[in-house]
Amino acid sequence: MPEIAQAHTPMMRQYLETKARYPDAILFFRLGDFYEMFFEDALTASEALQITLTARSKGDDKVPMCGVPYHAARGYVARLLEKGFKVAICDQVEEPGKSQLVKREVTRVVTPGMVLDDQVLDPREASWLGAVALDDGRAGLALLDASTGQLQCGEVDGDERLVDELRRAGVRELVFSSAADGARAEAIARAVGAPAARRDAAEFERAEDRLRKHLGVPSLDGFGVSGLPLGLAAAAAALAYLADTQRAAPRHVDRISRLSTDDVLLLDEATRTNLELERTLSGGRKKGTLLALLDRTVTAPGGRRLAEWLRYPLTDLARIGARLDAVEELTGAAVAREELALALRPVADLERLLSRLVLGQGNARDLRALAGALLALPALAAVLEARGAARLREAGARLRGLEALAAHLDAAVAEEPPATLREGGIIRRGHSAELDEIVAIAEDGKGWIAALEAKERERTGIGSLKVRFNKVFGYYLEVTRPNLHLVPKDWERRQTTVGGERFVTPELKTLEEKVLTAEERRAALEERLFEALRQAVAAEAPRVRTAADAVATADALLSLSRVAAERGYVRPEVDASEALEIVDGRHPVVEAVLPDGPAAYVPNDVLVASRDAPECAEHGALLVITGPNMAGKSTVMREAALVVLLAQMGAFVPARRARIGLVDRIFTRVGASDDLARGRSTFMVEMTETAAILHNATRRSLVVLDEIGRGTSTFDGVSIAWAVAEHLHDVTGCRTLFATHYHELQDLARERPAVRNLTVAVREVGDRVVFLRKLVQGGASRSYGIEVAKLAGLPAEVLARAREILKNLEAMEVDEGGHPALARGRRRRAGPSAAQLGLFGGGAAADPAAEEVAKAIRAIDLDALRPLDALNLLAGWKKSLE
């Protein structure tokens, strides 16, 4: 950035001085009807926004510049935010012409985590800022949504857990102390995938005192956040960042809650991704996810609340039961659902309207929308209070108490106000007598002048009297010479002309002032009245926040009941046991997208219990699931995880019957993907996720594993899969669904009492294979991979060759090098050296090493040999023969 030199114009010096205070932001500098950018900002913005880069002359130099129209700035700001930039908005804070240089100030700084504009925000997604306070081995975190005023704080052990919580929330931006370890903070930000800001360490200090002062309470005990020094430090820093960037006191943040993992079902990033809760694995779309299926909400806050429940399922039986009671009542009452939907429809986004108004960024249209929403609350409250479920009645009660504010706003704000204050017409007629008079003058100034002229003619008897105007004298009364003797003594002479004289009266001067300054006074008075209304809203912020919370809750409950009623879901039994019993369960998303409709879905039972639970004797704790590709193993396992998640978020489930013993964590290891950016192969990703499961799963966890070990050699893969299964059975003892193509793992059931074998049934009809999609007791004997390849459309000659190779492999045919005779036909043509050999020789001379292997095989007691031991022996023999 160039030095602030006298060579620059006053305006450019003003720009440079402002830019120096915001070096990490792109400065939008208001010049008339445009926001202009200069120097490096212009170069950066023109490239990011694909707008024309021009230049401004400064002596012999050219200053790079670009600009965007003032009225279209929001869209450009949104695009810069998407690319991770901050934008400082520098506005004109006085009317041009009042001084040589218009006064300008930064009115707000828009960052990825500090967005209030409803045209930039996704109405159905929260916009979280994550503030982090680091200590040795422990971290405090705070989540703040500036657009709704929600503030939560908590503490976690270890950076891995911290990253997981930040990613679960979907934070848009991170804030760290300037005193924090830079490398550690950078690693956390990189893992979370969010831009980070470093703030003065003082913003993290004296946190409890500052929070008490902001919230106006003598103690934080009532919020349940005591004993969290790091969490409170992060919360104080988040509030400071909000106040600094928005240039306003965040009065809408009137409470703080504890961000606790003790009473929620934990879902790590891999699990959320694998279960496709909010984004599909293919393409990262919303359509095709569980959230898209469940979201039948009427309001945007309801949609955000539903997403929150999906991210944070419960482990508190009482809270789960209360939600289920409400969903059950609405599911069985179609008329009540329709009444509730109709009552919710006129309720705008109270949370975000309140935030914009309190922070000084709202306009008259926001006030009108707020008035309309508040006016609709009594009817909504009546619908909810008429219900039987406690959660519904409580929500209705929390909507009361805002009737006076609603009436005040409705009486004050015009029905269809303009977008900006300066356009005028934001206040209703009748709200302010002073404003009504000013507006009348502004709208009918000529009529007022004509009325005064007529009145003075009648009073004086001067028939030729005229009220005229010029720029020098303003309004005046003009009297011809023959009538000068009729001029009253209270008139004041201003000018003598050839034909007569010009006068003014006190009334005319008053009227002149009113008429000439009416527009300016109207704008100023409307601004004062608007500010008074804004302050009235801010004074009721706590009640509005409470009502907004109730609206969101009622809408989310309605959405769950709509889905349950339309799709035939049932109320799950959620208890303190360690059993999982799903009878005729269905995958909610898969059944919804079947071309032949949900009736075509084949339901399945999943019955499993932790190793030490009474139900384990019947169900088992570890289900080894085998079966061909495409038969539906992965779908059934995901279905079980989703049924648990739905039940613990308080929703009905797609099943004929479901009993869910509380689960503390769901782990899934499904699918395979490289992490090339971090130099990790598919197998490394698989092993890292598996290690996390083995280290963190408890007896109450649900573990879903699909094809563990397939990313390496067969022997290594089987060995790892076997050992992982043993650990989950012997050490963890949790409910585990373990799908595999390693049929050797079926032998675990002989050695481990809580292991059960299941397979997905198939039927062979001639040379065709029909997948029945049904889990049955027992193990699979074949994988039917070639049949799946046929379905995928592989050429016939490739399929024929594959069958030939498969027969060779199954017969253990090997060539003289000890390898399966995969290219037998070609090698025959090559000469006698490729003749088919027996498994242990059969050539001209016996191999001593092969003879030793054969001798060892003959000595084995097959009935006492474990599969894992057999694999180890095979590996040793192979090595001795190489």
Swiss-Prot record:
Record has tRNA processing as a keyword: no
Residue positions binding ATP: 627-634
Alphabetically ordered keywords of this record: ATP-binding, DNA damage, DNA repair, DNA-binding, Nucleotide-binding
Molecular functions (GO terms): ATP binding; ATP-dependent DNA damage sensor activity; damaged DNA binding; mismatched DNA binding
A GO cellular component entry from the record: cytosol
SMART domains with a match to the protein in the record: MUTSac, MUTSd
Domain of life: Bacteria
Pfam families referenced in this protein's UniProt entry, alphabetically: MutS_I (PF01624), MutS_II (PF05188), MutS_III (PF05192), MutS_IV (PF05190), MutS_V (PF00488)
GO biological process terms on file: mismatch repair
PANTHER family cross-referenced by the UniProt entry: DNA MISMATCH REPAIR PROTEIN MSH1, MITOCHONDRIAL (PTHR11361:SF34), DNA MISMATCH REPAIR PROTEIN MUTS FAMILY MEMBER (PTHR11361)
Record family assignment: Belongs to the DNA mismatch repair MutS family.
Function statement: This protein is involved in the repair of mismatches in DNA. It is possible that it carries out the mismatch recognition step. This protein has a weak ATPase activity.
Listed name of the protein: DNA mismatch repair protein MutS
Natural source organism: Anaeromyxobacter sp. (strain K)
